[in-house]
């Protein structure tokens, strides 16, 4: 008996020693299969809907979830059950994660957060085990919210081949589908998930009964951008006379995360300059930093290069101003930036712009060719400065023909499909090689036509081109008001 007791004691000592060396009970070996979900317990000081600006439609959709978590009985009395899952879809930086936290904050319930990539492990079966553990914890804490960020990491469409795909990822997805089937809509566990690749998700995951509701979280419009700027401006010391509407118009197409970065950059610039608060100029400069990078202070152009860049930028602005339905010129500069731009012309729409006519798109192509056209008109030569303009003009002309049906030859036939619309919109042609050759010819003809229009506009307004270029050369940066004052001067 005594030798047996001694043997057990020695075994326990060795076991404790091994656990210490491996990091104790919290080590990887002893935590396999645990979800590692970040749990934010309910708190009255959490993120609320008031902290999320610019996404009114998404908030309206999610308010019903909050009401259910507050008072589920009124839904149960009528026999209604909440959606088991809500899928938040939209471009990066639009506030999908923040909205999910705001739902939990408004409902004052626990919030389990986990990224899709955290489920996939090197050991087969660990991902499925983590899913089981996550849902077990959620049911114990119900009512609560489970949030899976970047769900496309585990929710991608399964391959049709017998041996295709990632076995571990597919097992994890299968377990997630099983868990979502395993509880009713009245259990008090709401699953929120976010993705910017909804088209890649498995149909079994997005069908009714699993993710019943899809909530788009799009880029904010003008009013949304203004509201977001005001929310983030509360976090810094800022001048009282800041025109947030103007800043919002200048930041067209910016996401909520980018707008937050713009406000923060303005505060950092104020500190660098030794001021106690940020100003309108700080915010405007921050937008330019996001668009074109920081000013390149050590870049010194020759006088000849500076003249070329001045004419190039005035060429853009003059062609834009001489056409109808073009966005007003906000600013023109020939100060080099870290993005590689030696100068740029900023145009800002007066309000929201949801549609573009064929004429407007052609005018935009003409404006893009205006820089090169000015070089040809004045110097009789061309430079590499128009490389980005050429790329944008070609892309726009191709889209007119292949996607928007603005070609008489092809009429309303889609020649191009867009994939990953929330991640830049990769395109692929869906036509024969002969048709592709015809498309190329029409793209060349369209850009050439607008280039010739730009050349004519600049030739007809050569005196103003010279006067404005000389003014820009001297000042280096001019406002849209200064540009229009000289242009309209008799």
Mark where each language-model region is.
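Walker A/P-loop NTP-binding motif of AAA+ ATPase domains
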Residues: 37-248, 254, 266
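Short pre-active-site segment immediately N-terminal to the catalytic Zn-binding motif
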Residues: 297-308
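Flexible hinge/switch segments at interdomain interfaces of large molecular machines
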Residues: 34-42, 105-110, 152, 196, ...
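Long amphipathic alpha-helical segments used for membrane anchoring, targeting, substrate engagement
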Residues: 1-43, 400, 422-424
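Soluble catalytic regions of large protease machineries
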Residues: 83, 306-310, 317-490
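Conserved C-terminal "switch" segment of AAA+ ATPases
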Residues: 184, 203-204, 217-284, 293-296, ...
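Proline-centered turn/helix-capping motifs that create local helix->coil transitions or kinks
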Residues: 18-24, 74, 146-147, 151, ...
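Hydrophobic alpha-helical transmembrane segments of multi-pass inner membrane proteins, especially
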Residues: 10-12, 16, 272, 289-296
